[in-house]
Amino acid sequence: MEEKQNAVLGTAPLGRLMMKFALPCTVSLLVGALYNIVDQIFIGWGVGYLGNGATNVVFPLTVLALGLAVMIGDGACSYVSICFGKNQPENANRAVGSAVALSVLVGIAVAVLYAVFQMPLLSLFGATEANLSYAKEYFTYITIGVPIYVFGQAINPIIRSDGSPQFAMLSMLAGAIANCILDPIAIFVLHWGVMGAAAATVAGQVITAAMGVWYLFHTKALRLKADNFKLRGRILGAYLPLGLCSFLAQISLVIAMAATNNMLVQYGAFSKYGADIPLTVLGIVMKVFQIIISITIGMAAGCIPIVGYNYGAQLLRRCRGVLWRLMGAEFLLGVLALLITQLFPRQIIDLFGSESELYNEFAVTTFRVYLCMLPLATVNKAAFIFMQAMGRPVESAGLSFFREVLLAVPLVMLLPKAFGLMGVLYSMPAADILTFFASCFVLLRTDRQLRK
């Protein structure tokens, strides 16, 4: 049964197979992104833009925890798929067991660090005098849920690699629905403000994690034993590098957000908008961008088991077929997202509360400038993940690091010197254009190798 299930990855029509795996993965990640969007919408109407500004300060710290989770989960997912392609099920079982144990330990460690260094971290990510009290309150409750969040996000790609993308999707969907129901109750009925939004988020994460625990006792191809949950250096060394791209993508984003938030506060203070409007607006735009990128990553990450299996089985023609189908779909997604954000920025920003005309003016400008290269951004992100699926962590992580650290951070620091606050907005499209050339080089070289 196990061999038959895995063999489908090497024989089924690629288009149908990609849809089968990518759709549930995309929905799972999209639902995860909606956690933040839902919080922003209800906080915007129930607390105001300072509350949204506070959640934007905390957001990079959530991304950091996510980065550690996906390094473990995506790395294990890639390794498990390759093991199945090579008919090495015991190595797959050991990788999953150690990934589960590691995610629990990492989640606890991160929560302790967040609790101990709360104030320095909030200051680092751009908290202002006006939003600091909201940020502290929100961050305190988010920190309590970090171990649960890390486990839930790490186990999700592992469930997909076991051939259950639909269950992975449902576990995320259940948590998100709970969050959507509890958010308005906590904010508008119980009047808990940002604390209520955080509590609703953690409650949703508990449901997702609980479903992940249930699945560990009802796996398909995997056969987990107590001995598999030990941390073995050889197994960790085999799969963690494969998740390095996912981690660097997130940690690089955290570094870029820290630089961006501080530049917004610094240059916004000398503009007509002040410090808090730019900080809040860009945070909301980034949440919308996260929805787009969640679809991008979902489409690409859903193909990881397909690429990993076929690469392990040396079915290179099928890997090449996935490559160009994926890149074409990602480019079309970017074009569609670009049209929506360019044509309807005011309608999008109105979802997050009613604010001043000055606020709306900066929001519209930010949408149209900051997101003007979305077709390139989606292709870049998919390129990072495809290289990870091929078992090439150096190229994958290198592209991600090049985009977020070597380009985005210097650009966001330098462009404001010439263009003021607008320079912060120019930094993202500039980084996407330059990264696109590097992505094309890597993808074309990979295509030549897959032709052989």
Model-found features: residue ranges?
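Small-residue-rich hydrophobic transmembrane alpha-helices
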Residues: 52-112, 149-168, 279-345, 378-399
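Helix-terminus/linker motif at the lipid-water interface of multi-pass membrane proteins
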Residues: 34-52, 122-129, 185-192, 254-284, ...
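Residue-level signal for short hydrophobic patches within transmembrane helices
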Residues: 15-34, 38, 61-68, 144, ...
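Short runs within selected transmembrane alpha-helices of multi-pass transporters and secretion channels
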Residues: 73, 142-160, 168-179, 197-210, ...
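Transmembrane helical elements of multi-pass membrane transporters/channels
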Residues: 20-39, 141, 175, 204-208, ...
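Small-residue hotspots at the loop-to-helix junctions and early N-terminal turns
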Residues: 47-60, 135, 139, 198, ...
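Hydrophobic transmembrane alpha-helices of multi-pass small-molecule transporters
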Residues: 64, 179-183, 209-213, 291, ...
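Short alpha-helical transmembrane segments in multi-pass integral membrane proteins
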Residues: 1-22, 80-147, 189-244, 307-373, ...
